[in-house]
Amino acid sequence: MAVQKDSNKSLSPLITQASERHWARLTEVWSEGLANLTAAQQQELKTVLGLSDYIANQLTRSPEWINALFADDLQQVERKLFDAQLREQLASATTEDMAKRLLRRFRNYQMVRFAWRDFLDYASLEESLLDLSALAEALVIGARDWLYKEMCVQYGTPMDKAGNPQPLLILGMGKLGGRELNFSSDIDLIFTFPEHGETVGGRRSLDNQQFFIRMGQRLVNLLDQITVDGFVFRVDMRLRPYGESGPLVVSFSGLEDYYQEQGRDWERYAMVKARSLGPWNHFSDELHSLLRPFVYRRYIDFSAIESLRKMKQLIAQEVRRRQLTDNIKLGAGGIREVEFVVQSFQLIRGGREPSLRQQSLFGAMDTLYSLGQFEYLAVDELKHSYLLLRRVENLLQAIDDKQTQTLPNNALDWARLCYVLDMTNEIDLRTHIEAAMAKIHRHFKATVGGEEGEEKAEHWTAQLWNVQQDDHAINLLAEQQIDDDKLWPLLSRWRETVTKRSIGPRGRETLDKLMPRLLDELLNQPSPSAAFEPVSKVLEQILTRTTYLELLCENPGARQQLVSLCCASPWIAVQLAKFPMLLDELIDPAHLYDTTSLDDYPSELRQYLLRVPEDDMEQQMEALRQFKLSQQLKIAAADVTGVLPVMQVSDHLTFLAEAIIEQVVMQAWQQVAVRHGVPSYLAESSDTGFAVIGYGKLGGIELGYGSDLDLVFLYEAPENMANSLTNGDRPIEVGHFYLKLAQRILHLFSTRTTSGELYEVDMRLRPSGASGLMVSEIARFGEYQAQEAWTWEHQALVRSRFVFGDNSLAVKFSQIRACVLEQSRDKDELKKAVREMRQKMRDHLLKVSEGEFDLKQSPGGITDIEFIAQYLVLANAHEYPELSIWSDNVRIFGVLAELELLPLMSAQHLTQSYCWLRDENHRLTLQQKSGKLAYADVAAHAERILAIYQAILE
């Protein structure tokens, strides 16, 4: 039987209350067993029940473990036995569900044992971390080996080309790799296999990579899935090549190619701790040999310091954004800083010093001391400070098996920590923790060369922000030669308004630090008062969100971008004020102005959505909106700084919309299919039988900021299947299925979340307009266009384009569109119809004062140009089918000029004027102004356009 080390320690009243509560629960399920315990055993059990809710909950579920725990030697763990014990238990598992239960029961028993030892101080921290790491490794390898046998029975054994069996190797990363795993840590893994080939001896052959990807998926499920018995470990696979967008398993050669060609600096840091799990063999040797050149350079590599600085900056930004106060891992002087210090030295000198190529943090520290890279005092301070933080972290997590590194926010958990660590009270323990973190941060700053501070000694802008008398403020501005008499009244009134707001002491302190720094930026603008107005509107929206004030306070680049973008575009200022999450985009100017490549929007969006659980519909909707807002901000930032010309701005906004349309349709499809299944004839297909047609600006690849989407939905059903049903639990007719799909798509677009509406969608261009069905069968759509549609609907069809759907539907839509546009038409009747429609639009939409010009609707404006293009296509496409190819006006004018249907000079005038007018419209949008200019500013363009319009259409 184990004996508690200090049996005279008394429990605090809070711990005693927790103990009594858990003892009462345990008595309800195991009263006879408790009565049979000795007095010493009862006292020890009561102590651990009071210290750990996790132990209490597990023992209440499995009280028979209590006798087993007392029978075991709690003061010693034979971690070498884990593998054999687990192998013996898993041998009886005949299904994955049985294996899951055995793995989880084994894990939970051992974790209770470890927590018991930790809380009663039976084990040093180093022992605990080794025990936890050994348990995790045994569980991962035990699950892998059991699953490998199951998979080989099903698919055969994976072989290389020479006929040698191929294993799945697992790299343990992070603390698992370093054998320093804490109590509730997730485990970072990378799966790999030696060589390509295929399986042999199974019911059907599989490519090796397919085999191992399936095995990897099932292995993650074995370990990570939450069942009634909990989970084994949370598994994180994001450190693999290409992260979440990469294959789950890659070959050795795939790993080598990735790290040689695309490996990033942070991945070098991650790879320092990488270790092949399980028994070591020649494959393990080969794997570590191919990774070594990427991690450890042959030369002394001081670039590691700069990489470290950047990574720490990103972590600090994340801490601020997520408001992680009291975080002993990520905060200044936290656990991560010790790891960074040691790993940076390993990366710098590991290429020359093989002894530094080790996963253990403590071992690396000792080696650095022996090599003369660390002073004894530095090693001693770092070790003792690190051990204290890791001990606190381990105990925090063992209280309730939660993955936390944040100090408690309740008195009971502080009492528990103080009891185990022999501290008098919370203040005493906090003092020790803060002292340890201060020592760590001092060594970290010495390693990375410090951090650029901004604490300027009583800068005059601090005086300006704090000054109370108007005369004093005006004198301060005059001394600095600031000639802007509107600034002080604005600043003074705003400060008075802010003073009345309830923003809390932390918010107030942060604002007082931020404002002098922000004033520095504002006073560098041509008109500080004009700059202050939009910036102050943003600040007003984040006053109660201290994390964003801190972000601006501690990031000079973000402040600079905030001021410059708000000055350049009131529209951007409004976006930042409405959606403060966009402030995160300002942190890295290089990233902000690096717009996504046109073809990369779909993959970027897929990557972004991977952060959100697939089954969390609200979070998926919010993520779509956040992605749109952040990408739109990047486009606007590049626009106002002249990085993107107008044609490319519209291209980016259009391609962004198309990527979002694809995701919205697929999400809607999944949501409807879960309830009703899919059309039976699509059960074995990845096709949807559905298409989205873009009209108007989307169709013409000419979207602007805030443009709505003109959409038409089509579907295709085989003739003999038109009335067939879906294959789900609640089957419905195919037409009804696609109607529900259309309704769900519109819901996903239009629902307002905290990040607003995704897009406003206009469906009025569908067959029969507002009175028509929400979605049309494509054959019926073709009939309508050919026989019933009005001329204005054919004009709209000129600007239509297939934007999402199956290839077969794309072909059919293109055929219908070409067939309709290429109809022979009476030109006089066509002219009359086009002119009448143009006049109707003008009568309905044109509202200008004298001397004003509406860029879209005034005579000689954008709409006149569009009508010229549409008329010329409809009038001539029957003779010149190439006119039906394009949906955008610029390329239509190009084709018309080539065919000599439009004089070259006229085509150039129309194209130039069209681009200029759209550019002005973009500019006015970014200035938060309506699309109107003084007629005098537009006269040259308008008169030229009107002359061409009249020559062609009148």
Swiss-Prot record:
Pfam families: GlnD_UR_UTase (PF08335), GlnE (PF03710). CDD domains: NT_GlnE_GlnD_like. Residues 1-452 are annotated as: Adenylyl removase. The keyword Magnesium applies. GO terms for biological process: regulation of glutamine family amino acid metabolic process. Residues 458-954 are annotated as: Adenylyl transferase. One of its GO terms (molecular function) is magnesium ion binding. Its EC number is 2.7.7.89, 2.7.7.42. HAMAP family: GlnE (MF_00802). This is Bifunctional glutamine synthetase adenylyltransferase/adenylyl-removing enzyme. It comes from Shewanella oneidensis (strain ATCC 700550 / JCM 31522 / CIP 106686 / LMG 19005 / NCIMB 14063 / MR-1).
